[in-house]
Amino acid sequence: MQAQRSERRPDRNETFSGSIEFTIPVDLAAWQNRRTTQAEAISAASVLIKYAATEALAGRDPIACPVHLTILAFFLPPGAAKFRRGDLCHTGRPDTDSVAAVIMSALDGIAWKQRGQVAELLVMKRYGPRPGVAVVIEPADDLMTMATAGEA
């Protein structure tokens, strides 16, 4: 006879609270590498994103409420010293909408039911010591509550 798990799995209709955060050690600059096709690089990144999201959700069902998605992409700086200080934004390829599209597509059905649930989106590209992507998913309802509380 198997022992029952003591932790309760959240119901599909339960409101989502808190935030889900995870990082993916992926080099987005590889999307522009001529040796591998862009489709192969994006496919490999999608697998990493799906795995990281599945681990972060820890068995929860996809979120049913509107969400705020924050994406922070880090790229290795070029050799110039001014880039190594970390105070400059990355302005090269891939562009922010491409980064967001790949991440949002990979999270469909895992983090949320459909990508239309992303009500707020913030994408930042920076130079950093290691390439990678940090993703934070928060309920958009909580952000609206905080914004309207200041108006009262």
Model-derived segments and spans:
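Acidic, proline/glycine-enriched N-terminal capping motif
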Residues: 1-152
